[in-house]
Design a protein with these regions (language model features):
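Membrane-helix interface and helix-disruption motif detector
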Residues: 27-42, 59-63, 82-94, 188-198, ...
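Extracytosolic and intramembrane catalytic regions of membrane-associated proteins
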Residues: 425-586
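Internal/C-terminal transmembrane anchor helices
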Residues: 251, 377-400
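N-terminal signal-anchor module of multipass membrane proteins
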Residues: 1-54
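Transmembrane-helix bundle segments that line or gate the permeation/cavity pathway
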Residues: 30-34, 43-184, 208, 212-224
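Juxtamembrane membrane-water interface segments of multi-pass membrane proteins
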Residues: 2-16, 57-66, 112-117, 139-159, ...
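Short aromatic-rich membrane-water interface segments that cap or initiate transmembrane helices
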Residues: 192-207, 275-295, 347-358
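Hydrophobic alpha-helical transmembrane segments in integral membrane proteins
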Residues: 392-417
């Protein structure tokens, strides 16, 4: 019997929840689009999850500890965005949040369609994200509109005002530019107002409004949506004999491989090198291949168990158990070999992340292996919680900081005879404090010099405002030279014998010409012989004595634009920071 509701009833509680969703949607959109995945994003995600969970918890249902734990770990992961500056890890964590938050909310509301103990339960996240958030948008909007009409005079007037504000935005966007072009006095009045970013306003309103309705629809649908009962489907799959044939062939190959490589495996555990191999060759070879093998083995186990036509017989389970034990053994062996390599050559991002993945695969393999003979084990719940917990740890630790700290301490303590400064330089802001430590404490003068150069020429990015702030980046700023010029030209105004004059300081290699245009004049700076301008070279320009309305373009010898900047007509601040350029007025 179809029990699907054509609309979701809404009362005062839904109206309050909708207003909270509007705030969260606009806030999260603004801080993400114009601040990145940093402090603002962390606050926005935490607020949206807390609002949704609070709305769904007051429904008289027994609270699921599993769902609450998922959401709590999501909050911990979201908080890490205010600490870490690792773009790759943040991307992975965003993917985690996109799956875990809908899954946790669905289980909390009791609207999960699949058993949380099964691997298929992850599909509920997709159902909530697409099926409810988008599919139930008309129903939730209809219920919300009806609630506004029935909420009394204040509710009707409030809805009318919101609708009027929505219509006024595009109208004003047309009127204001036309009035500015028609009247100089009106344009001058607006120029004196605080800076207003039209693109930011439009982006926030348009995308924030869309996100607000999606957040509300997700919450309302999780509370009111009733899924039509589905008839149980006959289990289809492959005969056990077919799967056992596949598993036996895999087991046979592993048996032969283990026998042929036994000396190498035991050597890895004992710390003894096979003859004719150096430490680097022995420890490095095969580590990443073993990581891939672990993933393939786990896939074979899940494939065989999920495609078995009937309940997997003991023969299939024992074959899967053998593959699981081999997987754990491969993880232990690869880890032992990698520890040998790390002891002499230190850590890298790739080694750390690969090791984390292998440990996770080993944990999943153990859980699946136990589940083979203990079917009531909620292995999928454990897998989800372990994945989120490991993700939270990796995010908060910050891989660049962890790698740099280990390598620096191991090198300075004598545990490592050499340190890869090229890799240290490739790390992010988290490595700067430890590179600075090398510059001060390393005995090798070459290492000290390389460390000093890395600290001096590191690509420092100062947060434009609180939205783009994160702890690792903030900490690295303390080690930046007082006057750091990166990838461009610093613009300064200093008094001299002729009064205030504008001069440029070339801050990058390859600049051949710098064009400067003011509201009244234009000119350029080039060498007579066409040779590139030297980094640090000062070029005096007498046609400007302020930044107001100044346009600067730096070109290479081919005429390609390396950097350009147009300063506002009312720019008179004493410290102007834009992207990678630092502009100072003295």
């Amino acid at each position: 019997m179809e029990t699907y509701q054509n609309n979701h009833p809404a009362g005062k509680r839904e109206l309050v929840f909708f207003l909270l969703c509007v705030f969260c949607g606009l806030f999260l959109t603004n801080v993400t689009l114009f601040g990145g995945f940093h402090l603002g994003f962390a606050i926005g995600v935490i607020l949206s999850v807390v609002c949704a969970a609070g709305y769904l918890m007051k429904n008289g249902r027994k609270k699921s500890p599993y769902a609450l734990t998922i959401l709590a770990l999501c909050l911990v992961i979201a908080g890490s965005f205010a600490r870490s500056d690792d773009a790759f890890v943040k991307f992975v964590m965003v993917c985690f949040l996109l799956v875990a938050i809908p899954l946790g909310l669905a289980i909390l509301a009791g609207k999960n369609r699949r058993d949380p103990k099964a691997a298929a339960s992850l599909a509920d996240a997709g159902f909530v994200f697409f099926g409810l958030s988008f599919g139930e948008l008309p129903a939730s909007t209809k219920g919300l509109t009806k609630a506004f009409r029935e909420s009394g005079t204040l509710g009707r007037k409030g809805g009318a005002v919101l609708l009027g504000l929505g219509f006024s935005v595009p109208v004003l966007l047309i009127l204001i530019p036309l009035l500015m072009g028609a009247d100089a006095a009106f344009e001058g009045l607006l120029d004196k107002l605080p800076a207003f970013d039209l693109a930011e306003f439009l982006g926030t309103v348009v995308f924030g409004t869309c996100l607000s309705f999606l957040l509300y629809t997700r919450g309302a649908a999780l509370r009111f949506y009733e899924d039509a009962p589905r008839a149980p489907k006959d289990r289809k799959g492959l005969p056990a004999l077919t799967l056992n044939t596949l598993l036996v062939s895999v087991v046979f190959v592993y048996c032969v491989y283990l026998v042929s490589q036994l000396a190498y495996f035991t050597g890895g555990f004992a710390g003894l090198l096979p003859e004719d191999y150096t430490l680097a060759e022995y420890a490095r070879r095969g580590f990443f291949e073993m990581a891939a093998l672990c993933a393939v083995n786990l896939g074979i186990m899940i494939f065989s168990l999920s495609l078995c036509r009937d309940t997997a017989p003991k023969s299939t389970r024992f074959l899967c158990l053998f593959i699981g034990l081999v997987t754990v053994f491969l993880v232990a062996t690869a880890s032992a070999k990698m520890l040998l390599y790390i002891g002499s050559y230190g850590l890298t991002r790739l080694r750390v992340l690969t090791q984390v993945i292998m440990v996770f695969l080993a944990v999943v393999t153990v859980l699946v292996s136990v589940w083979l003979f203990v079917p009531r084990l909620p292995y999928m719940k454990a897998v989800v919680l372990v994945a989120l917990a490991m993700g939270a740890v990796v995010s908060w630790v910050d891989v660049d900081t962890f790698v740099a700290r280990y390598n620096t301490h191991a090198y300075l303590s004598g545990k490592m005879e050499q340190i890869d400064m090229a890799h240290m330089g490739s790390l992010g802001d988290g490595a700067i404090p430890y590179i600075d430590q090398l510059a001060k404490e390393a005995e090798d003068p070459m290492v000290r010099q390389m460390a000093e150069d890395l600290v001096t020429h590191h690509g420092y990015h100062k947060a434009e405002d609180w939205r783009s702030w994160n702890y690792v980046n903030h900490k690295a700023q303390k080690y930046a030279p007082e006057e750091i010029i990166r990838d461009g030209v610093a613009v300064e105004i200093s008094p001299d014998s002729r009064g205030r004059s504008l001069y440029l300081v070339v801050g990058m290699e390859g600049v051949t010409e710098i064009e400067v245009s003011t509201p009244t004049t234009s000119g350029g700076c080039i060498h007579a012989d066409g040779s590139p301008l030297k980094k640090g070279e000062k070029l005096w320009l007498e046609q400007a004595d302020s930044l107001a309305g100044v346009s600067i373009i730096a070109r290479d010898k081919y005429g390609e634009i390396l950097w350009m900047m147009d300063f506002p007509k009312n720019e008179d601040s004493e410290h102007y920071v834009i992207d990678d350029w630092i502009v100072v007025i003295e």
